[in-house]
Design a protein with these regions (language model features):
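N-terminal nucleophile
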Residues: 1-283
């Protein structure tokens, strides 16, 4: 993912609402939103590219109440193409029977094997004690992004947040605008899984921001401008999918994915279900 907007326990009916865009090269093969054949309790799209590591996902949900999503941290000067695919981390969290703290601790030695990332992990398996955390193997020091030697999960308080290709809530223009429009959509949402267009409308906004508002992330100004919209579209790279996930406090959920190519058309998948929290899952 390259833009994740999320509401955590800030709506009377929903525990978690996520509206996200995944940006990628058009030629990179990706499996559409579906239940995974090798982990049949996990729902999400999936990377089909030939990469080092487990086939991952940018955003996924498991029936036992786990959610995870990931963005890369834009730092072109330090990017190493030989490291493991970051989407592997979300797949590992969803497929393992570990708490958030146990998972981060178990992966501690492996975090150096990934380029910079932001990882969201939620555990809704216990309705009386839901948890959402943000974890990154990078930190901001002296105005520059540095590698973090020891990684700790940061607990997220109830509220509305935006995450792109920098630290959590870094006020990039797309994050500021996205959070504001997401908050409006949340306020209008009556908790009935209807009116998804309230979310997809702003996710599909291709308007670039003025150069004076853009961050300096190490790419040239033309590319900085091309990457600035919520919805990106260039010749070879762009927003490949928009995803809306809504999880009610009773454990019912809806996930909608819209998939895009270089044309203006899209394909859509919508799946609804019920989390089986603290119960034996049998699919």
């Amino acid at each position: 993912m390259c833009l994740i907007l999320f509401s955590w326990n800030s709506h009377p009916d929903y525990s978690l609402v996520v509206a996200a865009n995944r940006d990628e090269f058009y030629e990179r093969p990706t499996q559409a939103l579906d239940w995974w054949t090798d982990h049949q309790t996990i729902l999400g799209s999936r990377d089909n590219a030939d990469v080092l590591g487990m086939r991952g996902t940018a955003l996924g949900l498991s029936l036992d109440g786990k959610f995870s999503a990931i963005t890369n941290i834009r730092a072109p000067s330090e990017k190493n193409p030989d490291l493991r695919t970051r989407g592997e981390l979300t797949a590992k969290f969803l497929s393992q029977k570990l708490s958030i703290e146990e998972f981060i601790q178990a992966q501690q030695k492996s975090f150096m094997q990934y380029n910079g990332f932001n990882l969201l992990t939620a555990d809704l398996s216990k309705p009386e004690k839901p948890q959402l955390c943000w974890t990154s193997n990078r930190m901001l020091m002296g105005g520059k992004i540095r590698q973090r030697k020891v990684v700790h999960p940061v607990t997220i308080d109830p509220g509305i947040y935006g995450l792109s290709n920098a630290m959590l809530d870094t006020p990039w223009p797309k994050v500021r605008q996205g959070v504001a429009q997401f908050a409006q959509a949340i306020a209008m949402d009556q908790g009935k899984f209807n009116h998804p267009e309230h979310y997809f409308k702003f996710l599909n906004n291709p308007s670039a921001f003025p150069d004076s508002e853009l961050p300096a992330t190490g790419v040239n100004q033309d590319w900085e401008r091309a990457l600035s919209p919520l919805f990106i579209k260039t010749e070879h790279y762009g927003t490949r999918s928009s995803t809306l996930l809504r999880i009610r406090k009773d454990g019912s959920f809806q996930m909608i994915e819209r998939r895009f190519d270089q044309s203006d058309k899209y394909e859509s998948t919508s799946i609804e279900g019920q989390l089986q929290r603290s119960e034996q899952i049998d699919r």
